[in-house]
C-alpha cells in the first residue's frame, strides 16, 4: 500500500516538472525569434560589425597617400580641381579605391581578431624557437667550457704525474750513481790494502798469517766477512787462504752454507772419532757448542 502511494507521488512530481519545462520553452521561443530578426533600416554589414566598403577604401587611400613622395603631392596641389567636379572625383576615387582594395584587406577587417590571434600565436612560437636556439647555444657554450676545463685539468694532472715520475727516476739514478761511486771507492781501498799486504816483507806476512790462524782458533766459529774486514782482505781471499791452511794441515774445520768457518782442533777430532767408535760414549761438549755457535 505504501509502495503504491510513493509511486503515485513520484509520477505526479514528474508530470509537474515536464509541464513547467514545456511552458518555459514555449515562452523563450518568441524572444529568440525577436533577437534573431534583423533590424530594419540597418545594413546587414553594420549589424555584423563589418565596416563599409567606402570606409575601407578611404582607409586604403589614406595609407597610399602616406606612401606617395612629397613632390608629386605638391605638384598635384598646384593644380586645384574644378569645384563642380570635386564631388564626382571623390565618388570616383571611392569607387576606384574600392575596386583596388584587395580581397585580403576585407578579409583582414572581417577576421581581425582571428588573424591577430594567429599572428600572436606565430610570434609566440617564433619567440619560443628563438629562446630554444638561445638555450641550445648557451648549453653548447657551457659544455664546451666544461670540456675545456676538464681537458685542462687532465693535462695538469698528466704534467704533475710526469714530473713525479721524472723526479723518481732522477732520484733513483742519483742513488745508483752514489752507490756505484762508493763501490768503486771501496774497491780501490781494498785493492790498495791488498797491494800493501802483498808487498810487505816476509816477516810482516808471517806475523799476519800467525794472527790470522790464532784469530780462527780463538773464536772457533768465525764469519768469513768479519774475518775479511779484520785483516783487510776480500771474502774470496779469506776463503782461499783458509782452504790453503786446511790443505797443509795447519787448521781443520768446515765452511757451512751460512758463510761461517767452524774450527775443529785435533783433540776435538779425536773425541769425535772416539764417540763414533764407542756408541755408549758421549761426544766432547766443546764440539757441539762450537758447531752450533
From Swiss-Prot:
Subcellular localization: Endoplasmic reticulum membrane
Domain of life: Eukaryota
Broad class of where this protein is predominantly found: endoplasmic reticulum
Biased composition (Low complexity): 52-84
Pfam families per record: DDRGK
Renumbered residue ranges of the record's region Disordered: 30-158
Keyword Hydrolase: no
Residue spans, topological domain Lumenal: 1-2
Molecular function as annotated in GO: ubiquitin-like protein ligase binding
A biological-process GO annotation: protein ufmylation
Keyword terms, alphabetized: Endoplasmic reticulum, Membrane, Transmembrane, Transmembrane helix, Ubl conjugation pathway
Biased composition (Acidic residues): 87-96
Keyword Transferase among UniProt keywords: no
Residue ranges, compositional bias (Basic and acidic residues): 107-158
GO cellular component: a single term: endoplasmic reticulum membrane
Transmembrane segment boundaries: 3-23
Family: Belongs to the DDRGK1 family.
Quaternary organization: Interacts with Atg9; the interaction is transient.
This protein's name: DDRGK domain-containing protein 1
Gene name tied to this protein: Ddrgk1
